[in-house]
Amino acid sequence: MKRASSTSASKATAIRWRILLILALASFVSYVLRTNLSFAAPEMMADLGLSEIQWGYVLAAFTAGYAIFQFPGGVLGDRFGPRRVLTVIAVGWALLTLVTALVPGREAFSTTLIIAALFGVRFLVGAVHAPIFPVMNASIVRWFPVGGWALPLGLASTGLTLGGAAAAIAVPLVIAGFGWRIAFLALAPLGLLIAVAWWWYSRDEPADHPAVNTAELELIRGRQRVGDTVESDEPLAWLRVLKNRDVLMLMLSYSSMNFVFYIVFNWFFYYLVEVREFAATDAGFISSAQWIAGAAGAALGGWLCDRLCGRLGLRWGCRWPVIVGMAASAALLLVGAFHGTPAVAVTALVLCFFFNQLNEGPYWATSVAVGGRHAGAAGGVMNTGANVMGIVNALLVPLLAARLGWTAAIASGAAFAVLGILFMLLVRADRTVD
């Protein structure tokens, strides 16, 4: 394949950043098409006659499918390449969003059958969304040099938070005018657009992209560690990822952080409408502000992690943003749960999500550093545990709310944030699985 020429020995092309842009757009669309259910919750629950605990089962279905297919998603991304896998799953996002809109109502199905139908569809939605971040992880490790992963990972995570912000405004507005079914139908084509764009422009390896010049290729490869680009033929190589102590501690820490994340993902909009008694459209704008704050936190966390890794090394450079982010999010979550003034509580919860997302880039950079050439699998293990915690959240939060009230349900996340700090202190990002 003809390589793009470089006009200057020091002037590299910027194809890697265009690849990152499409990845960020993919994470944006993925989050629009997975958070839509949370923002449709009050309307759907009323229309379909579901209680909070029954709705928790529906939410758990997504995270069950997402968790089960995380590790296989990492394996698929490493084996078949990010280009094929992301294209296929993006088509799946679109199709299953359409299917969600077709779930029958109370006039056709009993409550049990409605829950079963929603559970089945949302399980499949979780399954096809599961590979996105392991695949993104594997793509970034191919396209960016060692020591420069946290910033692109943080920027890619910014796409997901902006997707949540967009859905928080768009979904309630469309529902107010046309109903929840039309909202799902209108969003479905976004998945097809991502599939087309990614297949057309991306390549699994920088060397295979005709627009990458020699200078950019040398920049990407110049700082790789020995062995990073060598593919292992050992059949049991994947088992080392599952058995590695640092990967397991990282999974437990990231899982703890994600309990707080799932309070936002699953329940924040519902909490604003049903507990704090905001109008749905107002709650949408507040939720959007929270997701935008998360986007800023994700971008800052990635940049900060790269800077700290350069000064302190991988071990503490990846730890410090997580320690600060988790401690601050725990404190702000308690303020949001216990303060009686809605404006103060909401402000604290918005800031809580900023600090929660400060951790995203550092966590994924750690998974890449620890995973080495098995970065996709390491990311899959980490995110599998995180989404098992999503199932716990979907079932535990409404149970706590029913028995102890919503204050206790929201505040429970602070304990998990503290656990996340303790587990992260046991992770060493400066040693790999190999």
Give residue ranges: language-model regions:
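Cytoplasmic helix-loop-helix junction between adjacent transmembrane helices
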Residues: 121-160
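A late C-terminal transmembrane helix in Major Facilitator Superfamily
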Residues: 298, 368-403
